[in-house]
């Protein structure tokens, strides 16, 4: 069994638990996911099965889309509702929409983020959350991410609790920490804040309406209809230029051979090569040797 399943990860489950359950349902160990979702986050989690595990990295390259909520008025150790409260500041008056929009605009485009201590980023071979659980703080590597859209959906002031809730939609590059983004938004507004809710709407080119739940997958296996829900591995490569090669070229590709631009009749920097209706390899142009060489082999048969 080979293909990609756009899974709907339910809130409360880890991404690893989803993979573990699918291994039991599909009776195969060759399964991987593209892009971890925190346990408290629901939404799109592309799962690669069998030979499709070779395209996990390419699925992860695509942009993401999220919808969520920022709760302004206090901060926690984890930047979400799971952590211990470490700071509090009442929102005495409703924050105007104009200020929220201005702050969101300042966080749109290319920005620098520092990963939260409660994250899986490794420093000196150890995950940050392991340091955090031990009560240690370490210097974290900065990363550059792109926020292509940061949209205000609604804003609601809670007069009784002196807090404010902001619902948002965000489209971003891989590696973006939404928790950090919304906490930074709260800081720009002059308050501590936490991410109170998050759903991933898009990942790996898949949207929420394409997803299957674990129960859906189990039912499809029972009725022997899963194949119709599996996406081919070339779905992960759909944004690359495509080229169908002939027998002579395929024999070279099978052996990892290099190909000349004249053989492929292309000037693309990277290109997906198919033969006999199946994606076989990803090649890239080597300017030094002026030849196309293999980046990744997907099938040699």
From Swiss-Prot:
Biological processes per GO annotation: mRNA pseudouridine synthesis; tRNA pseudouridine synthesis
GO molecular function, one term: RNA binding
InterPro entries (UniProt xref): PsdUridine_synth_cat_dom_sf, PsdUridine_synth_N, tRNA_psdUridine_synth_TruB, TruB_C
Pfam families: TruB_C_2 (PF16198), TruB_N (PF01509)
Catalysed reactions, semicolon-separated: uridine(55) in tRNA = pseudouridine(55) in tRNA
Record-annotated membrane-spanning stretches: none
UniProt keyword list: Isomerase, tRNA processing
Enzyme class: isomerase
E.C. code: 5.4.99.25
Database matches in Gene3D superfamilies: Pseudouridine synthase (3.30.2350.10)
Positions of the catalytic residues: 38 (nucleophile)
Record family assignment: Belongs to the pseudouridine synthase TruB family. Type 1 subfamily.
HAMAP family: TruB_bact
Role description: Responsible for synthesis of pseudouridine from uracil-55 in the psi GC loop of transfer RNAs.
Protein name according to UniProt: tRNA pseudouridine synthase B
Higher taxonomy: Bacteria, Bacillati, Bacillota, Bacilli, Lactobacillales
Originating gene: truB
């Amino acid at each position: 069994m080979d293909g990609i399943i756009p899974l709907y990860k339910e809130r409360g489950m880890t991404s690893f638990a989803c993979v573990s359950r699918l291994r039991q349902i599909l009776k195969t160990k060759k399964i991987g996911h593209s892009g971890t979702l925190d346990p408290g986050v629901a939404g799109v989690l592309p799962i690669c099965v069998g030979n499709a595990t070779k395209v996990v990295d390419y699925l992860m390259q695509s942009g993401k889309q999220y919808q969520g909520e920022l709760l302004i008025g206090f901060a926690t150790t984890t930047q979400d509702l799971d952590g211990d409260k470490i700071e509090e500041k009442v929102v005495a008056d409703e924050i105007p929409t104009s200020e929220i929009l201005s702050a969101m605009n300042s966080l749109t485009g290319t920005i620098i983020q520092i990963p939260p201590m409660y994250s899986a980023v490794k420093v000196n071979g150890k995950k940050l959350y392991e340091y955090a659980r031990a009560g240690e703080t370490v210097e974290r590597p900065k990363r550059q991410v792109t926020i292509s859209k940061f949209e205000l959906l609604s804003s609601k002031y809670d007069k009784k609790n002196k807090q404010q809730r902001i619902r948002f939609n965000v489209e971003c590059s891989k590696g973006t920490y939404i928790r950090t983004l919304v906490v930074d938004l709260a800081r720009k507004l002059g308050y501590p804040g936490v991410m109170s809710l998050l759903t991933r709407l898009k990942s790996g080119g898949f949207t929420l309406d394409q997803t299957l739940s674990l129960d859906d997958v189990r039912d499809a296996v029972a009725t022997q209809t899963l194949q119709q829900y599996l996406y081919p591995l070339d779905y992960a490569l759909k944004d690359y230029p495509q080229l169908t090669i002939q027998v002579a070229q395929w024999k070279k590709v099978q052996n990892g051979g290099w190909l000349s631009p004249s053989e492929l009749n292309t000037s693309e920097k990277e290109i997906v090569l198919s033969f006999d209706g199946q994606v076989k390899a990803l090649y890239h142009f080597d300017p030094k040797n002026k030849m196309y060489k293999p980046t990744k082999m997907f099938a040699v048969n």
